[in-house]
UniProtKB/Swiss-Prot annotation:
UniProt superkingdom: Eukaryota
Protein name: Pentatricopeptide repeat-containing protein At1g05670, mitochondrial
Transmembrane segments: none
One Pfam assignment: PPR_1
Keywords: Mitochondrion, Repeat, Transit peptide
């Protein structure tokens, strides 16, 4: 049972950091002073240029024409007046028709289409739009000014603002006009000018709305160089009358989380309540997402409890964040439960949530669960995107099902989705791991034709596949191609080539290559040295392997468990079991936790030497240390006991292996069947064979020979006739396939 969160009650350490956080919002201001509200001044009177008698008559004529017109367009009605029309006439006509807002807009559009309007007339129409509550038109008119090319921002701002103030009193007197002007400046990134508007409005006794200030705060928070300014603004604006609201706090909480300062964000959530504000779902969801990013699941659950106590229900954003975290830390059962709870609450999961789950299950190798969610998306009419397809394709590639991966890749194109470099690279990687290099290069060519440039990861994947196939010449060609197109091979690229050289027996060439890329400024890593050690161990040069280890340690590189397992395998492979046990004891003494692979090397060699007592002792030792045996452990022990004809023990271990869900190889089935046949346990041999057949595995020629020999010797033919027929069929099919290839 989780302990309930104490809300505003804080531990001493938390209280201390909370005080520090409040001090963060009480920093000295730096050049952000305000004029006091007592120094306010009135808006100026508007005094337009006086019209001459002739101009007055001309304006009167135009006004009558546009007022009396019916359905006739203005361009036709005012055609006779075009040549005499001047900018001053525009303002004088606007004064006559300002009570008819629709007519104002039509006339202003007509005037602007004939000649450029001056800034004064633009400000007048902006005021009239705001007075008519048409804020969208006002915003559009202000934006059109700032969209002009080659505009001197500093001078233009002064002129625009001064004229907006000058025309304010007689043309609208709606303070929202300055909010709109301010917000447009912020949208255009003119933050310094926006700040000046805020300060200048204080001189006239006006404080911009909290919505405008929130727009400003949001823009500041998105600029990594202005986060300090955002904090100062958040602290200072209330001093001159800005009343922050919940949305304001949410903005600050969000950008504090983005800075990675999740504790401070949580403190700000508490500060909201101290100041009398009630956090909403967005407030909590932002902090929850922050804790999810940093993997602090316990704090997430506590915040959820607080939310529920306050009557707030988690939203889709919160569920998505929690599911994402649970998938990242491999708690997929809990992630699935959170998903089910989301559905029960009536919240429809989106593409992001489904993709997160699909990706999580694929990475664990549970392609069945991933596929279930993928096809469930279709049934809910939720469209998979490129990321969704990439995740599921990667999952099928991971288990080697390249047929299904290829089908899904084709399906993407049919649905109009364009794979990105990650999708192409995942598919290429799958084909490379499956040894289908022709298909890998086919996808590589497709990638280039689709206009998607292969990156270092793509080339490294292909190089790795070629090296594992032993085609080092082609791998080197690709390496040179990388250089040619300006891609810099990284340590993963070179490690693939080093591994290929070692696998082909060219250890000295591999060592030479390491020297060359290190001389070029690229440092070898633990994988590089472990690969060289493995090559020397397999060739029996244990002294050189240990020298490589010393060199690696001398460079400050930390060996991994794989490094020690390579050394252990080398000792065991060459009969140096005492050295292997010494290495194991040294690892334990140094606090280096061995894994199943470490113990397996010893178990295997003791089984090969028929020393089942020692093998069993190693097995018991690993179990007592909390290291669970894997499939290889059981295979080694089953084969060892079969070889020693301890069929009872072999059968027990085989059953335990199956019970734990480990896959059994053909060779293990074969050894067990042969063991039972040698001990004349025909029923047991048949039972193992039936299990093998249910797994879809075909017996080899050796098993066929064993059953044949037993049959012709007249030993229990009723138990073996059916298996012989099946073995012959499978064996002949295999032979035909080999002949065809």
């Amino acid at each position: 049972m989780k302990k309930p969160f104490t809300g505003l009650l804080m531990k001493r350490g938390t209280l201390s950091s909370f005080r520090n956080f409040i001090q963060l919002f009480s920093l000295q201001s730096r050049g952000l002073s305000f004029s006091t509200l007592t120094d306010t001044r009135p808006f100026p009177d508007y005094s337009p240029k006086k019209a001459s008698v002739r101009d007055t008559e001309f304006v009167h004529q135009i006004t009558n024409v546009i007022k009396l017109r019916r359905a006739e367009p203005l361009r036709r009605s005012l055609k006779p007046y075009e040549c005499k029309f001047k900018t001053d006439h525009l303002i004088w006509v606007l004064m006559k028709i300002k009570c008819d807002y629709r007519l104002v807009l039509d006339f202003f559009d007509w005037a602007r289409s004939r000649r450029d309007s001056n800034l004064e007339s633009l400000c007048i129409v902006i005021h009239l739009a705001v007075a008519s509550k048409d804020l969208k038109v006002a915003q559009s008119l202000i934006s059109s000014f700032w969209e002009r090319p080659k505009l001197n921002v500093t001078d233009s701002f002064v002129q625009f603002f001064d004229l907006l103030v000058y025309t304010y009193k007689d043309w609208g007197s709606d303070p929202r006009v300055f909010d709109v002007f301010f917000q447009v400046l912020v949208d255009f990134g003119l933050l310094r000018e926006a700040r000046r508007v805020f300060e200048k409005m204080l001189n006239y006794g006006l404080v911009l709305s909290v919505d405008s200030c929130n727009v400003y705060l949001t823009r500041l928070s998105k600029d990594c160089y202005k986060t300090a300014t955002a904090i100062i603004v958040f602290r200072e604006f209330p001093e001159v009358g800005v009343c922050w609201n919940v949305a304001s706090y949410n903005i600050v909480i969000h950008f504090v989380c983005q800075l990675g300062r999740i504790k401070e964000a949580h403190h700000l959530l508490l500060l909201m309540e101290l100041k009398g504000y009630t956090p909403d779902v967005i407030s909590y969801s932002t902090v929850v997402n922050g804790y999810c990013r940093f993997g602090e699941l316990d704090k997430v659950w506590k915040l959820i409890e607080v939310m529920k106590r306050k009557g707030l229900k988690p939203n889709s954003y919160i569920y998505g964040s929690i599911i994402g975290l649970l998938c990242r830390i491999c708690k997929l059962a809990e992630a699935e439960e959170a998903f089910s709870e989301m559905i029960r609450q009536g919240i429809l999961p989106d593409t992001v949530v489904y993709t997160t789950l699909i990706d999580g299950f694929c990475k664990r190798g549970d392609i069945r669960a991933a596929s279930k969610f993928f096809y469930e998306m279709h049934s809910r009419d939720i469209t998979p995107d490129v990321l969704t397809y990439t995740a599921i394709i990667s999952g099928f590639c991971q288990i080697g099902d390249m047929v299904e991966a290829g089908k899904l890749f084709h399906e993407m194109f049919c649905k109009g989705l364009e794979p990105d470099s990650v999708t192409f690279t995942e598919l290429i990687n799958g084909y490379c791991k499956a040894g289908h290099m022709k298909d890998a290069f086919r996808v590589h060519n497709h990638m280039i034709q689709a206009g998607c440039s292969p990156n270092v990861v793509t080339y490294t994947t292909l190089i790795d596949g070629l090296c594992k196939e032993g085609d080092l010449d082609s791998a080197n060609e690709l390496l040179h191609e990388m250089w040619k197109i300006g891609l810099q091979p990284n340590i993963f690229t070179y490690n693939s080539i080093v591994n290929g050289l070692c696998k082909s027996g060219n250890i000295e060439e591999a060592v030479k290559l390491v020297g060359e890329f290190e001389a070029a400024g690229l440092n070898a890593d633990t994988v590089t040295y472990t690969t060289l050690m493995d090559a020397y161990c397999k060739s029996g040069e244990m002294d050189k392997a240990q020298e490589i280890l010393k060199e690696m340690l001398g460079k400050g590189l930390q060996p991994t468990i794989v490094t020690f397992n390579v050394l252990m395998n080398g000792f065991c492979l060459h009969g140096m079991l005492e050295d292997g046990e010494k290495l194991l004891n040294w690892m334990l003494a140094k606090g280096i936790a061995p894994n199943a692979t470490t113990f397996n090397s010893l178990v295997k060699q003791y089984c090969i030497r028929n020393n089942l007592k020692a093998a069993t002792a190693i097995y018991k030792d690993m179990c007592s240390r909390g290291v669970g045996p894997d499939g290889k452990t059981y295979e080694n022990l089953v084969k060892g006991h079969c070889k020693a004809r301890n069929m009872k023990e072999a059968w027990f271990l085989f059953q335990e292996m199956k019970g734990k869900g480990f896959s059994v190889s053909v060779s293990t089935y074969s050894v067990l069947i042969k063991g039972f046949l040698k001990r004349k346990k025909f029923l047991e041999a048949r039972e193992v064979f039936d299990q093998m057949r249910r797994e879809g595995l075909a017996a080899d020629k050796e098993i066929f020979d064993f059953f044949s020999d037993t049959k012709y010797k007249g030993k229990r033919p009723d138990t073996i006739v059916d298996p012989i027929d099946e073995i012959i069929e499978n064996y002949l099919v295999d032979e035909q396939l080999r002949g065809a290839n």
